[in-house]
Amino acid sequence: LSFGSAEQCHKILPGIAQGELVFCIGMSEPDSGSDLASLRSPAKRSDDGWLLNGAKIWTTNAHEADYMFGLFRTSTVPDNRRGGLSQFLIDMKTPGITVNPIVDLPGREHFNEVVFEDVQLSHNCLIGTEGEGWDQVTAELAYERSGPERYLSSIQILLALVDELAARPN
């Protein structure tokens, strides 16, 4: 909502509101660990828009997603690894995208590697401003990681603490 174009919002918001669309977030890359600024997967300008290559790893529910919010390197900015990153709205049915499940110890497949091989996106798939992806994703992650789902995930611990304190005489 904050960074998407009016066209992008009109395209996806009705499906989000109706619970019909599933999204995944493609940021982490193989061999990068937790260093998001080290991502290398390129998005190169083409006559028709953007050409994506590379891979994302630990992408939750990519195998079920309709779309990905993907972070790619659109340019190299000397002395600023956070510069030159851009976000894209990616239809997961686009040719050239392969989703490989990562099986966890109990045998579940929640996480995935997503491989991009000459994936062609139109110009209007760029979210926000080219090269401003770092600021966009940090703003989005700050919201995501401080919203109701964050503190509500601790509700059982808080309720147990209230019960424990209520049971004490003083």
Predicted region positions:
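Glycine-rich beta->alpha junctions and the first turn(s) of the following alpha-helix
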Residues: 97-170
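A structural signal for short hydrophobic beta-strand segments in well-ordered beta-sheet cores
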Residues: 41-44
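Short glycine/proline-enriched turns and hinge-like loops at secondary-structure junctions
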Residues: 35-37, 48, 61-66, 80-84, ...
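A short core secondary-structure module
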Residues: 53-100
